[in-house]
Amino acid sequence: MTTLDPAIAGRLKRNPDGLVPAVVQQHDTGEVLMLGWMDDEALARTLTTGRATYWSRSRQEYWLKGETSGHVQWVKEVRLDCDGDTILVKVDQVGAACHTGDRTCFDADLLSGADRPGPDARG
């Protein structure tokens, strides 16, 4: 078990299951890759090893990204948002980030936005 720095742990606002959402972004392009969940142990492992580790809510176990698929996330930067309730993990993604085999989990369904006018078109 890896211990999270108490100064970091004290800033986290966890959900009732002890988890914090982690938004994962490609470090050099800003592309949003996925959303994972971390508890203190997953965050400590991520900070210590330089590889992204998450808590799998479905399997109820730690998940080292790329351990079985080879689609590793090399961590470049980790930030905590202003409220302490969301983690931003900037990574160098090797291969697909999504379990579907897509590069990102956010490229399949556009719900809204593509046909909306920008601020200059409102008049």
UniProtKB/Swiss-Prot annotation:
Residues reported in the UniProt entry to bind Zn(2+): C82, C98, C105
Binding site for Mg(2+): D81, D83, D85
Keywords for the protein's UniProt record, in alphabetical order: Amino-acid biosynthesis, Cytoplasm, Histidine biosynthesis, Hydrolase, Magnesium, Metal-binding, Zinc
Needed cofactors: Mg(2+); Zn(2+)
Compartment list: Cytoplasm
Catalytic activity: 1-(5-phospho-beta-D-ribosyl)-5'-AMP + H2O = 1-(5-phospho-beta-D-ribosyl)-5-[(5-phospho-beta-D-ribosylamino)methylideneamino]imidazole-4-carboxamide
Record-listed E.C. numbers: 3.5.4.19
Pathway in which this enzyme or protein is active: Amino-acid biosynthesis; L-histidine biosynthesis; L-histidine from 5-phospho-alpha-D-ribose 1-diphosphate: step 3/9
Gene3D superfamilies linked: Phosphoribosyl-AMP cyclohydrolase (3.10.20.810)
An annotated GO cellular component: cytoplasm
One matching Pfam family: PRA-CH
Chief location bin: cytoplasm
Cofactor details (free text): Binds 1 Mg(2+) ion per subunit. Binds 1 zinc ion per subunit.
Single biological process term from Gene Ontology: L-histidine biosynthetic process
InterPro entries: PRA-CH (IPR026660), PRib_AMP_CycHydrolase_dom (IPR002496), PRib_AMP_CycHydrolase_sf (IPR038019)
Keyword Amino-acid biosynthesis: yes
Molecular function GO terms recorded: magnesium ion binding; phosphoribosyl-AMP cyclohydrolase activity; zinc ion binding
Description of how the protein assembles with itself and partners: Homodimer.
Family: Belongs to the PRA-CH family.
Cited PANTHER family: HISTIDINE BIOSYNTHESIS BIFUNCTIONAL PROTEIN (PTHR42945), PHOSPHORIBOSYL-AMP CYCLOHYDROLASE (PTHR42945:SF11)
Free-text function comment from the UniProt entry: Catalyzes the hydrolysis of the adenine ring of phosphoribosyl-AMP.
Protein name listed in UniProt: Phosphoribosyl-AMP cyclohydrolase
Source organism (scientific name): Nocardioides sp. (strain ATCC BAA-499 / JS614)
